[in-house]
């Protein structure tokens, strides 16, 4: 299935929020561990191995993920693109909430909620506004 040039909203409709969580988790674990297996994802997310198996198969079918003969998970170009967009939003909101005085654990949870709720346009404008404020200091 070829999905090039789709907008983020189209990705969201295709993989839903839980799929985004899995992609983001795989990206984070790849940065931390290098190679990632389903069991690593299950531990990190606190979900069952069968749940990860279902998600992995869905993401593989959608063209976001592959699994090699050693059962290591690899993001496709499209999967990496989605994961990096989600991760960028997550980091942005987590940092801003912590800077505003929110407890780091609460900031992490709230950032997850915000990153899905905000539109691409609103996120882009907000990020631009914050960057302009930072430059003015």
Model region roles, listed by residue range:
Residues 14-47:
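N-terminal helix-turn-helix DNA-binding core of bacterial DNA-binding proteins
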Residues 87-121:
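Arg/Lys-rich, alpha-helical DNA-contact motif
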Residues 38-69:
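Canonical helix-turn-helix DNA-binding module
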Residues 18-21, 37, 78, 89, ...:
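N-terminal positioning helix adjacent to the helix-turn-helix/winged-helix DNA-binding module
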Residues 2-5, 109-137:
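C-terminal regulatory/oligomerization modules of transcriptional regulators
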Residues 1-14:
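Short, Lys/Arg-enriched N-terminal segment that forms or immediately precedes the first helix
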Residues 24, 54, 109:
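DNA-binding alpha-helical recognition surfaces that contact promoter or target DNA
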Residues 71-89:
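Basic, amphipathic "hinge/linker" alpha-helix immediately C-terminal to the N-terminal HTH DNA-binding motif
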């Amino acid at each position: 299935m070829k999905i090039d040039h789709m907008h983020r909203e189209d990705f969201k409709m295709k993989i839903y929020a839980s799929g985004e969580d899995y992609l983001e988790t795989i990206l984070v674990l790849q940065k931390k561990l290098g190679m990632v297996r389903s069991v690593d994802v299950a531990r990190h997310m606190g979900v069952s191995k069968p749940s990860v198996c279902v998600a992995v198969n869905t993401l593989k079918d959608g063209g976001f993920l592959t699994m090699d003969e050693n059962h290591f998970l690899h993001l496709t170009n499209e999967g990496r693109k989605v994961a990096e967009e989600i991760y960028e939003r997550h980091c942005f909101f987590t940092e801003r909430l912590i800077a505003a005085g929110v407890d780091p654990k609460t900031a992490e949870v709230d950032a997850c909620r915000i990153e899905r709720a905000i539109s691409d346009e609103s996120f882009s404008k907000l990020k631009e506004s914050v960057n302009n404020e930072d430059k003015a200091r």
